[in-house]
Amino acid sequence: MVENIGNGSAELVSYAKLNLYLDVLGKRSDEYHEIVGLFQTISLHDTLTVEICDGGFYLESNVALPSDNTIKRAWEMFRKNTGEEFGLKVTLKKKVPVGSGLGGGSSNAAAILRYLGEVFKIPLEDLLNIAAQVGSDVPFFLYGGTALVRGRGEIVEKLEDIEGYSVNLFFPGIHSSTKEMYLSLTPEMYRKGPGRVEELHRAYLERDYEKIRKLSYNVFEKVFLEKHPEVMYGLRNFGDGSIVKMMTGSGSAFFALYPLDEGNYPFVGGV
């Protein structure tokens, strides 16, 4: 979402995501893993104020970020792929926890690409190609809402948006490394989920809570809890009365699913 605020700058909203389903099907020859997942954006979001400028890249943030952050990579890859020469000033107000599995960094990158695409009139197909070069989850965030995601994350099939749900979040304050979590997987852990992602999507649309509980899955949850058993204590009283409680992404955040008016963060539709 882009909102012009004058003085040549714009304000971007960058939503977090949940993995309502996430399984790893195997390791590819390019060292990435083949995944299948049901992704969903929620109302928790970061805010970016951006301005095209002369010169280089400038970033102010309320949290520490690595020098090779996703926002800078998005700017670099956009310039490389389009041939456009411009500088960029970004002020980031981050609310999505870093290392939580909620996709904050990927969402930030997608917000930048979407904004630059509007400024320089770049088609969505080209933006998706650039997004895949920035990070595996970035293409999904160009759509938002509900989507079936495959490949290493770059194959995004937009689905009918799921409405009428909200979540509460539990973040144990642990930065979970996506790379480390993937390295922790062994071949016998592949393809262990129910595999019926379209059926899970339909269960959400039909409010079939029993089937939602039955088909929800995250391959990383067991691995994460084995690495961090202390998190179980924090989860004991989290999600009481929820439809389902599970981890998102490669951790470390967990979500508890509720009907729309009972959780803090409603599901958000896509573009």
From Swiss-Prot:
Keyword vocabulary terms for this entry: ATP-binding, Isoprene biosynthesis, Kinase, Nucleotide-binding, Transferase
Active site as annotated: 17, 137
EC number(s) on file: 2.7.1.148
Gene Ontology molecular function terms on file: 4-(cytidine 5'-diphospho)-2-C-methyl-D-erythritol kinase activity; ATP binding
SUPFAM superfamilies: GHMP Kinase, C-terminal domain, Ribosomal protein S5 domain 2-like
Residues involved in ATP binding: 97-107
Keyword Transferase annotated: yes
Pathway involvement of the protein, from the record: Isoprenoid biosynthesis; isopentenyl diphosphate biosynthesis via DXP pathway; isopentenyl diphosphate from 1-deoxy-D-xylulose 5-phosphate: step 3/6
PANTHER family tied to this protein: 4-DIPHOSPHOCYTIDYL-2-C-METHYL-D-ERYTHRITOL KINASE, CHLOROPLASTIC (PTHR43527:SF2)
HAMAP family: IspE
Protein name from the UniProt record: 4-diphosphocytidyl-2-C-methyl-D-erythritol kinase
Species assigned in the record: Thermotoga petrophila (strain ATCC BAA-488 / DSM 13995 / JCM 10881 / RKU-1)
